[in-house]
Amino acid sequence: MSLRLFEIDVPDAALADLRGRLARTRLPPDEADDWSAGMNPAYLRELVEYWRSGYDFRAREAELNALPQFRATIGSTAVHFIHARGVGHAPLPIVLTHGYPDSFLRFLKLIPLLTDPAAHGGDASDAFDVVVPSLPGYAFSDPPQRGGATFNIGELWHKLMTNELGYARFAAHGGDWGSTVTEHLARSHPAAVIGIHLTDVPFWHAFQKPHTLSAAEKRFLESIEQFPRTEGAYAVIQGTRPETLAQGLNDSPAGLLAWIVEKFQRWSDCGGDVESRFTKDELLTNVMLYWTTQSIGSSFQPYYDLTHANVVRWMLETAKTWIHPVKVPAGFALFPKDLSHPPREWAERFFYVKRWTQMPRGGHFAAMEEPELLAEDIREFFRPLRGHAAPHA
């Protein structure tokens, strides 16, 4: 086994450099106080000043280091992850996979609700052993190699859960890129995965063109086709010229802050007020993970993979077999302010759908916005499947 304990330890010099850069921030003269054209200039100024003079990274670092963090080298890739043990008899192991532009921080509010449900108004028999890896190229995980590595992360997760942690069978949950990784994991290892729970249908299925579509499916795919023109410019540039963008964001903390925080405002159920869902500290700590690890460029890799010619060919070939549903049970929790709103019949083309929940509120960052709603849906979905999990090795 290659497991080793991990603690975040950002050098003092790196924090001093950051404060200097923030003090020298040169923002455009625009004083607008709205989000209509992207990042709100007035709010960016406010955030930059708080980051420079009010935000206490060392306090946040200490909070994160109170979590059981590890790194494991799997093949040639070192993977960072949290491994939080459940409270009670025979907790069900589950791997939670985040997306972009967040990090393992997505699940911090969810972890205690899953590991110790009895302490939060739930049933102790619903407890989970929770594993939260950082995607390759995010935070403290090694970057992936180019050329389709995004679609091999499921293999890393399988080895992490079985070889490194000793779980013969386990559950999986994900959203955004996490849903793609979770699907691949379940398709490749149905004997190990007892079920999957997702907050979206992986975007890449839009490349598949079934001959017959319901009216709802047609509307959904039409909305997907509009996405690059209405909301998806970030994905286009990250998928075609990631290095160009990364040069600027890796050098400018204010630029990085704007690029990431704007998505938290746009994609959450915040009614226009991003701080109604996320505190300044939550927003900044997520950005700090990108800044201190210089991982914004490597976080773009899945987008580059998705648009790379070889990967597209791989996807089209894979589609011939992946048109059939995943063999393991799947549950979906759909949040109204997320980026896409697929109908159930679209999901049923690719998944063995056993649960479909339309949530009353919440957005793309559901585990941060509505952790209680998400936790309860995960508990209920996996409750009848618990007998299929093998004891911990």
Protein language model annotation of sequence segments:
Residues P91-G99:
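Short beta-strand element of the alpha/beta-hydrolase
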Residues G147-E164:
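Alpha/beta-hydrolase active-site loop
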Residues M1-E7, P11-A16, R21-L22, R26, ...:
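Alpha/beta-hydrolase
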Residues L113-H120, A127, E164-R219:
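Conserved hydrolase catalytic core segment
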Residues Y100-P112:
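The serine-hydrolase catalytic nucleophile loop
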Residues D102, Q238-A393:
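C-terminal subdomain of alpha/beta-hydrolase-fold enzymes, centered on the catalytic histidine
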Residues A14-G86, A90, E282, W291-Q294, ...:
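Non-catalytic accessory segments flanking enzyme active sites
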Residues F57-A59, H120-G122, V131, L135-G148, ...:
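Glycine-rich "HGGG/HGxG" loop immediately N-terminal to the catalytic nucleophile
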